[in-house]
């Protein structure tokens, strides 16, 4: 029977999650969905000083926005301390780990001496029990660390789904501390216990964890487990080619939401930031899950391109449902001081959205319908609202007031009739109408704008020219 696929996302809640971080959730989520497996969320919060519930909330909020649903969790490492201590005790009892009384000062001196001899600094196994080896009496009043008995000789070998075969000599690895003097377990140990207890089959994570992997594999095997498949993702670089980070100006995932990006656009962009399905650039969430595999993960660092993300967002805005876009855009309009009443927002969105790269830009374009009475520049009024144009404006207003139905087609026909009657070109009449009704010279098609403003508003504002 084939083992059920189980993947995990295991962030540290330190207050900030950017696109590079959330990609380490997206890929294991997609793989679990593709394989009809389970996706687990684990919060690695053992760094008590830097961890916070607010940061956990940001992680959950970011995942919810992208609809990365979880099957189990969130599990919190700080709530599993008793389990870690239990396994530490079992390992000491079984001879897989031992108490080490070497002080920090002694360890520093040892490493300094090794450096002076040109050797790699490492613990020398002084307190490691071996057959026939006599250990000194433990010093009084010293709380020991617990070290894992790393295998001597041989190598740790694994076939990384991204990097290929990796082989690390055990001689490069010293005996890892798995519990501190106060009994708290260390990061690498907690990860191993969690992955075993949660039956994780595939670990898809950033390649900054490659160096941890041989140590984790050795502990897993010592505990009788089978190591998962590892896929170490290359780094995501920012526009300057540096590792993406808050310090280097990366935006948080929720920041993209707040700037007016759509979750489907961010997910589509993220999916391509280190994985490819042929030349496909635009695809749905469902297509992504159907296509995703580990074989096509990129082997080189991916570089963030804001123009590409904006292009994708523009695509999803253009093809998006206008009712949904209206709901999402309204808060942005209100943040600009607009009051959404009068003109039908769904119709306004349909009119203005095609050139917008973000919902903020949609809101900016829509604002002319919702900012109250127009306040056109006096100089522009003087330039365009001339005595010569007044008769045409009066005729237009009268004809618009008499229309049997207020539609774009009827409004357009009325403009053409007035232009023909007075021998005018469209800009000569449209510009003053724009100023009077919208308060600005640049708008979408004038017939569409007037239709959305509504008959009463248009006639009232045109009357101001009289």
UniProtKB/Swiss-Prot annotation:
It is an enzyme of class 6 (ligase). The keyword Ligase applies. It comes from the Bacteria. SUPFAM superfamilies: An anticodon-binding domain of class I aminoacyl-tRNA synthetases, Nucleotidylyl transferase. Keywords: Aminoacyl-tRNA synthetase, ATP-binding, Cytoplasm, Ligase, Nucleotide-binding, Protein biosynthesis. This is Glutamate--tRNA ligase. A motif ('HIGH' region) lies at residues 11-21. It comes from Cupriavidus taiwanensis (strain DSM 17343 / BCRC 17206 / CCUG 44338 / CIP 107171 / LMG 19424 / R1) (Ralstonia taiwanensis (strain LMG 19424)). Belongs to the class-I aminoacyl-tRNA synthetase family. Glutamate--tRNA ligase type 1 subfamily.
